[in-house]
A protein has these predicted regions:
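Membrane-proximal intracellular helices of multi-pass ion channels
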Residues: 1-390
Length: 391
């Protein structure tokens, strides 16, 4: 185990992360909300920590193995979550304890969406932007972003990429070089974010909120800039836009890459995981709409459909946005949506949960075992195409 080489890479990653403090710092300058000092302090502290880790080990360049790649990922998320808590600690508003600051930082980076903050509407814009930015970086994975940058600094990225990517997609290289794959993933990620922000802005959401919610939507994180979450805007159009982009982000990014490469939309429907993912969403929307309509929870059929569509997609993709309290819903529905969150999104997406592909493989495995009960000597193989990868 090359511990000094590992320390060098972690130091480089922390130095890169320190540069992200510039963005919320600029927001603080634009809105003059008084939070700029917290990000300035964090920038220098993170830069110092990264430099202390990197400088003594700057000449330690060794070939990374799989176990070292996994260790770097674990160390980096631990260190990054800790450094990411500093703006919450240094900021006068909100006045968080160290424990709450750590919780907020790790919740953002892991796109969990749980929060210790209340009174979001009165917080500085820079702090609100920083929370959304944490989720956005955590959504695709800063490690994947770093893989696109570190080769410039002489660090190989394959083992880091394999350790960071979830599920079967980790062995599917869309480009011959791993750095090119990482850049392609982030290009798609950025394009979706820009498209989502513009759509929300055109739908009537203020520019700051549109950018913030596009970050959390594409990352499937669930943080909002308001205590009432998406319900603050009271707009069926905004609800629909966010739900659509949550579905897009819940898909395998390998499929988005195929479309970007000039292939037709048919590539989506040919993917069995995508078909199951959409099938689950449609089934849940139909069930929720019918039950809500039968119990007269909302005044009109259109409102019922809109609320059902949004809440189903938000819960099933593990985003956690809300537009209304589901405590008003029949108890059967919240339990159903909670179960759907265990499935989550597709492999290679920003969604959480077990991943649809694993549920699909579980069904196929079960079907194979039933066949083997009837024909014990037969040989049955499980074949499944995921985007451009094969299992």
């Amino acid at each position: 185990m090359h511990f000094r080489a590992i320390t060098r890479i972690v130091g480089l990653l922390v130095i890169l992360f320190s540069g992200t403090m510039i963005l919320p710092g600029l927001v603080a300058l634009i809105y003059r909300d008084g939070a700029g000092r917290a990000f300035t302090q964090t920038f220098f502290v993170a830069l110092a920590i990264g430099s202390l880790l990197w400088w003594p080990n700057r000449r330690q360049k060794g070939e990374l193995k799989s176990r070292e790649g996994f260790l770097i990922v674990v160390l980096f998320w631990t260190v990054l979550g800790s450094v990411g808590s500093l703006p919450f600690i240094f900021s006068e508003q909100p006045n968080l304890s160290i424990t709450d600051a750590f919780f907020e930082s790790f919740s953002g980076l892991t796109t969990t969406g749980a929060t210790t903050l209340v009174g979001l509407d009165s917080l500085p814009h820079a702090i609100l932007f920083y929370r959304q930015m944490l989720q956005w970086f955590g959504g695709m994975g800063i490690i994947v972003l770093a893989v696109a940058i570190l080769p410039i600094l002489g660090v190989g990225g394959m083992q880091l990429y394999r350790a960071e990517m979830p599920g079967p997609l980790k062995d599917n290289k869309m480009r011959p070089r791993i750095a090119e794959t990482a850049k392609t993933l982030w290009l798609i990620y950025v394009l979706l974010t820009v498209a989502c922000a513009l759509a929300l802005w055109f739908a009537g959401m203020p520019a700051f909120d549109a950018i913030g919610h596009s970050f959390a939507t594409i990352a499937i994180g669930g943080f909002s800039t308001h205590d009432a979450s998406v319900g603050y805007f009271d707009s069926p159009t905004i609800n629909t836009i966010i739900a659509i982009f949550l579905l897009i982000s819940g898909c395998n990014y390998g499929l988005h890459f195929s479309l970007l490469s000039g292939r037709s939309l048919k590539v989506y429907w040919r993917d069995p995981e995508f078909r199951m993912f959409i099938g689950v969403q449609l089934t849940l929307v139909i069930i929720c709409t019918l039950v809500l309509w039968f119990h007269d929870v909302y005044n009109s059929a259109l409102t019922t459909l809109n609320q059902a569509f949004f809440q189903v997609v938000s819960m099933a993709t593990t985003a956690g946005f809300t537009t209304d309290s589901i405590a008003r819903w029949p108890l059967f529905l919240p339990v159903l949506l909670l179960c759907s969150a265990f499935i989550g999104g597709c492999a290679g997406s920003t969604g959480g949960g077990l991943k649809v592909i694993r549920i699909l493989l579980l069904f196929k495995q079960g079907n194979r075992e039933l066949k083997r009960l009837v024909h014990p000597n037969a040989v049955y193989s499980i074949k499944l195409e995921i985007g451009r990868a094969h299992v």
